[in-house]
From Swiss-Prot:
Subunit relationships: Heterodimer composed of CysD, the smaller subunit, and CysN.
Domain of life from the UniProt record: Bacteria
Pfam families given in the database record: PAPS_reduct (PF01507)
Keyword Nucleotidyltransferase attached: yes
Keyword terms of this UniProt record: ATP-binding, Nucleotide-binding, Nucleotidyltransferase, Transferase
The protein's name: Sulfate adenylyltransferase subunit 2
Keyword NAD set for record: no
InterPro entries, alphabetized: PAPS_reduct_dom, Rossmann-like_a/b/a_fold, SO4_adenylTrfase_ssu, Sulfate_adenylyltrnsfr_sub2
Gene that specifies this protein: cysD
Catalytic activity field: sulfate + ATP + H(+) = adenosine 5'-phosphosulfate + diphosphate
One GO BP annotation of this record: hydrogen sulfide biosynthetic process
Function statement: With CysN forms the ATP sulfurylase (ATPS) that catalyzes the adenylation of sulfate producing adenosine 5'-phosphosulfate (APS) and diphosphate, the first enzymatic step in sulfur assimilation pathway. APS synthesis involves the formation of a high-energy phosphoric-sulfuric acid anhydride bond driven by GTP hydrolysis by CysN coupled to ATP hydrolysis by CysD.
Organism of this sequence: Magnetococcus marinus (strain ATCC BAA-1437 / JCM 17883 / MC-1)
Enzyme class: transferase
């Protein structure tokens, strides 16, 4: 009997989780944030339900501050695959003029991401939402179950989680409740890139190094992606060879200096990396709210 490789076991587990959700829930949806984890999750969904298409739509919570290359990639990918994409923007936040520059990262994230996600899930009537979070990313995610239950107000209680034994998942929920499902929970950042390399999965070019205009702000290399970003006194964008380990809203996402231009090179960097990929996320360093507090309020 042929033994499965590490990546084959992870793939099989993720596909099993996706099929369980479709079997147990009335109206699932897949959160598609356009990054590497979302790209892998989408690839797994295509495999899980082949030759048909995934029996659920994709949902992108758009803050309007994503990198331009992310939106181009999103639209091209969805069109090429012929998938159903729902894009939701918190129009109340837009009307209030909420931006990453006139609010703290914590308040901005709550209004344009957390509240926007709640709106989208309620308007769509979704009772299960796939997300691409992994346990190795951050300590609060490390203790979250694969089937992560939410109250009717979308709140997560880390002290009240159901046991998950072997590959058995209890999806019973009361009216108004829902779950967030994390089929990549047991993957690492290195696993993700090795799988992308193995399966030749397309990803946003921002993951690869090239000269980009950046400023150093609060110790992070912030890319000046468009003319909406106000420069502080003394700031002057300079071209540096950088790439991104994680992608979010461009004013809140720090780049890393690199010359890596392909997936094999990224894997090489991962093998010697000693810092978390989320170190470049400004929202994770905002003293106003920890990731666990954000998740309890309904964040991804």
């Amino acid at each position: 009997m042929t033994m499965k490789t590490h990546l084959q076991r992870l793939e099989a587990e993720s596909i099993h989780i996706m099929r369980e959700v479709v079997a147990q829930f009335r109206k699932p949806v897949m959160l598609y944030s356009i990054g590497k984890d979302s790209s892998v999750m989408l690839h797994l969904a295509l495999k899980a339900f082949y030759p048909g298409k995934p029996p659920f739509p994709l949902l992108h919570v758009d803050t309007t501050w994503k990198f331009r290359e992310m939106i181009v990639f999103r639209d091209q990918r969805v069109k090429a695959l012929g998938l159903d994409l729902r894009v939701h923007i918190n129009q109340e936040g837009i009307a209030q003029g909420i931006t990453p520059f006139n609010q703290s990262a914590s308040i901005y994230t709550d209004i344009m991401k957390t509240q926007s996600l709640k709106q989208a899930l309620e308007q769509g009537g979704f009772d299960a939402a796939f997300g691409g979070a992994r346990r190795d990313e951050e300590k609060s995610r490390a203790k979250e179950r694969i089937f992560s239950f939410r109250t009717p107000n979308h709140r997560w209680d880390p002290k009240n989680q159901r046991p998950e034994l072997w590959n058995l998942y209890n999806g019973r929920i009361a009216p108004g409740e829902s779950i967030r499902v994390f089929p990549l929970s047991n993957w690492t950042e290195l696993d993700i890139w090795q799988y992308i390399h193995q399966e030749q999965i397309p990803v946003v070019p921002l993951y690869f190094a090239q000269p980009r205009p950046v400023v150093v702000r609060h110790g992070a290399l912030i890319m000046v992606d468009d003319g909406r970003m106000p420069l502080l006194p003394g700031e002057e964008p300079s071209l540096r060879s950088v790439r991104f380990r994680t992608l979010g809203c461009y004013p809140l996402t720090g780049a890393v200096e690199s010359t890596t231009t392909d997936v094999a090179g990224i894997i090489g960097e991962m093998l010697v990396a000693h810092r978390s990929e989320r170190e470049g996320r400004v929202i994770d360093h905002d003293g106003g709210a920890s990731m666990e507090e954000k998740k309890q309020e309904g964040y991804f």
